[in-house]
Amino acid sequence: MDLIFDFSELCGRIIARYGNYAKFADAIGMSRAQLSERLNNKRPFKPEEIVFICSPDILNIPDTEIGSYFFTPKV
């Protein structure tokens, strides 16, 4: 059984900083379809994608908070 993650906190941060998913996808060099697959648990985020997304230039997520954005199980 695959673990399903709750990306609601990540989605909120994306909208707060970029206004919509399309602008965010463009900023990280990912298609909207690829981003949608990841946010809907169809494909996992790659470690290097997580590092880039959390960087100060993108979402500025501190290392200590990465777990709550990417690894919170959906209940």
What spans do the regions from the language model cover?
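Residue-level detection of the helix-turn-helix DNA-binding "recognition helix"
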Residues: 12, 40-42, 51
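Residues in the recognition helix of alpha-helical DNA-binding motifs
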Residues: 27, 38, 69
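A short, Lys/Arg-rich alpha-helix, primarily the initiator
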Residues: 1-22, 27
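DNA major-groove recognition helix of helix-turn-helix/homeodomain DNA-binding modules
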Residues: 48-66
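Short amphipathic recognition helices of helix-turn-helix/homeodomain-type DNA-binding modules
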Residues: 65-75
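Recognition helix of helix-turn-helix/homeodomain-like DNA-binding domains
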Residues: 30-45
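Residue at a beta-strand N-cap/secondary-structure junction
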Residues: 18, 44-47
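Helix-turn-helix DNA-binding elements, focusing on the entry/boundary residues of the two helices
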Residues: 21, 32, 50
